[in-house]
Amino acid sequence: MRKNRGFSFSSKAVMMCCLAFLLIPASFAFAAPNKPFPQHTTYTSGSIKPNHVTQSAMDSSVKAKWDSWKSAYLKTAGTGKYYVKYQSNGDTVSEAHGYGMLATVIMAGYDGNAQTYFDGLYQYYKAHPSANNSKLMAWKQNSSFQNIEGADSATDGDMDIAYSLLLADKQWGSSGSINYLQAGKDIINAIMQSDVNQSQWTLRLGDWATDNTFKNATRPSDFMLNHLKAFQAATGDARWANVIDKTYTIINSLYSGYSSSTGLLPDFVVLSGSTYKPASADFLEGANDGSYDYNSCRTPWRIATDYLMTGDSRALNQLNQMNSWISAKVSGNPSNVKDGYKLNGTVTGSGGSGAFYAPFGVSAMTSSVNQNWLNSVWTKTAGSSNEGYYEDSIKLFSMIVMSGNWWTY
């Protein structure tokens, strides 16, 4: 048997190795993040953050929440792909996929594998196109990664995936193996084509919602105003301004007409004549379709984020009323927040949920009058245990925003 020979590197050999390394194509290397976590973004003047804990402590809490989320829900999906485990049986949905792509791009810098995860999530998205528009994502897959329950899209997943790609362009640039910016623009244009009702300039429920029953319906949890502004900035498509303006109009119409005492928004909205109103029971998902339930619980986070990032005050009255109502309703204790309310404030839920209390922390950031309430929501959220994919995702994003670590395109 031959004996191994020892290696000794001459200076020439070292130079050759270094030259070979430099000749490796850029597509095989990952870029250093331009906006590593934590970012400590300056939000709109007059807005607040929790002031009973240090910035370092908030950053550490977000890191811990991310580590827990990643361990529980971010999973491999074959070679070179990742997905977000939505249910214990292994099913996933495009909503979850969008959350995964957003979280990985935001946590880059702290998490050294963030770009690997992001690119793997992108490849999974590419492998599951909607049957109606191939740039959008089929909304649900089973544990074998096969499309189930219809291969069409859901608007919220489409929007988060597109927005995450814009952030990825800012985070890592688009000169590597994936042109993040172009991919994002492609999805944005597909959203305009298939997820926007261009006769009303409203967001559809998905690319499937074109018949008379659903074509004029919309879902307030999709009212991601800052996403819409980023879409316009990235593409230069002025039509996005129509969608932004109409979305704010609907928020204020619902607030003035149906929830002036609470500021709450319903899960689903329909057009009746020329008026947008809460959907009736069992419109799409269940008895609480016209109430503040498991879709619209995200609206304090989604809508308030645009105010924090841009200062756009068109929904500020609605947000302020909601902040005042909920803090009084629960006597300043987020543990008393229930998982469901009618728009008049009557409780419909039976218990507590992080999906409901955490987003109220984001909306509380609009004014210093909410400081004690915001501090309480932060403490409750940061100290919470795992509940499930949906609750834990919303808690993570709410904490990212509350800690001052959200940023935009």
UniProtKB/Swiss-Prot annotation:
Entry keyword set: Glycosidase, Hydrolase, Signal
EC number per UniProt: 3.2.1.73
Region forming the signal peptide: 1-31
Catalytic residues identified in the record: E95, D156
Keyword Hydrolase set for record: yes
Matches recorded under Pfam families: Glyco_hydro_8
The keyword Signal is assigned to this record: yes
Enzyme class: hydrolase
Catalytic activity entry: Hydrolysis of (1->4)-beta-D-glucosidic linkages in beta-D-glucans containing (1->3)- and (1->4)-bonds
InterPro entries from the UniProt entry: 6-hairpin_glycosidase_sf (IPR008928), 6hp_glycosidase-like_sf (IPR012341), Glyco_hydro_8 (IPR002037), Glyco_hydro_8_CS (IPR019834)
Source superkingdom: Bacteria
GO BP annotations listed: carbohydrate metabolic process
GO molecular function annotation: licheninase activity
Family (UniProt): Belongs to the glycosyl hydrolase 8 (cellulase D) family.
The name this protein goes by in its record: Beta-glucanase
The organism of origin for this protein: Niallia circulans
